[in-house]
Design a protein with these regions (language model features):
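Active-site pocket-lining/capping segments in soluble small-molecule metabolic enzymes
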Residues: 1-36, 45-273
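Active-site catalytic motif of lipid deacylating hydrolases and related acyltransferases
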Residues: 40
Length: 273
């Protein structure tokens, strides 16, 4: 909320804001989304709201929340991060368009520790893996069928072709500048690392303070010893920012060619890493 209030006073070149969370319902619950939507709309921002990946315990709550936003703020765009929510919203509001969040666009290539595996594959398999998901004709057909006209994607060199392809298919492509989502899970990474799982539901302070994981050593099982990682290994294991149940990497190998990208997203969660 503080960041939004500052932005409302001095927006610079920013034209819109993205609220909510890609994957953590607890983060969403604690981040004053209704109040921020109201403030952002009042200040003339283009507003997008990420509805997190919906786990079973939160299904009814976030169905209701997504519908509430749509009906109270028809100018706000809902970004869903799982296919179940997209199917539900399209069935409820068949004439409305939606966005696909990073929970939908997340691909094999987004994982920094997979890149050396990817590059070791034969070229035809590399291309197949890089195209998986966002350049898959069946995926694109489903997105169009569900009324999706915009997609959020990570900033990744291996996705350059996907940006252009998605744009050519008629989608608005938004890219998180300098940021790649590395993992998305059900369990909360953040509370696990600070050993505070009993504080689930009252835990947002741990995310806002920021937790950075830096891999410096590895366990040598044969010799029962810890050893420093090599520079080569470190180059493919960059520092990661933990945010609830996702981890993000800043500038692994950002894209150099943004052909087809309509909007660059500046994510405050990684700005200080």
């Amino acid at each position: 909320m503080d960041s939004l209030e500052k932005l409302a006073k001095d927006r610079g070149n920013f034209t819109g804001v993205i609220l909510g969370h890609e994957n953590c319902p607890q983060y969403y619950r604690q981040s004053y989304v209704p109040e921020m939507v109201s403030l952002a709309v009042e200040n003339g921002f283009d507003v997008k709201v990420n509805i997190p990946v919906i786990f079973e315990d939160f299904l009814d709550e976030f169905k209701e929340e997504a519908c509430r936003i749509i009906e109270e703020y028809p100018q706000v765009k809902i970004f869903a991060n799982d296919w179940g929510m997209l199917y539900y919203l399209h069935g409820r509001y068949p004439e409305r368009t939606f966005g696909a969040g990073k929970g939908i666009s997340f691909t094999y290539a987004d994982n920094p520790w997979n890149e050396h595996i990817l590059l070791a594959e034969k070229e035809k398999y590399q291309e197949a893996l890089k195209a998986a998901n966002m350049q898959n004709p069946d995926t694109i057909d489903q997105m169009k069928l569900l009324g999706i006209d915009e997609i959020e994607m990570s900033d990744l060199e291996l996705s350059e072709g996907a940006y252009k392809h998605m744009n050519d298919e008629g989608f608005i492509v938004s890219v998180n500048k300098g940021m790649t989502v590395a993992t998305m899970s059900r369990a909360c990474h953040c509370l696990r690392f600070v050993d505070k799982l009993d504080e689930m539901g009252n835990c947002m302070d741990y995310c806002t303070k920021g937790i950075v994981l830096s891999i410096k050593d590895y366990y040598d099982m044969a010799n029962n010893d810890h050893k420093p990682v090599s520079p080569e290994t470190k180059s493919i294991q960059p520092d990661m920012c933990v945010d609830g149940n996702i981890t993000m990497v800043k500038n692994i190998q950002p894209a150099g060619d943004y052909t087809g990208v309509s909007c660059m997203i500046h994510d405050e969660r990684i700005m200080d890493i």
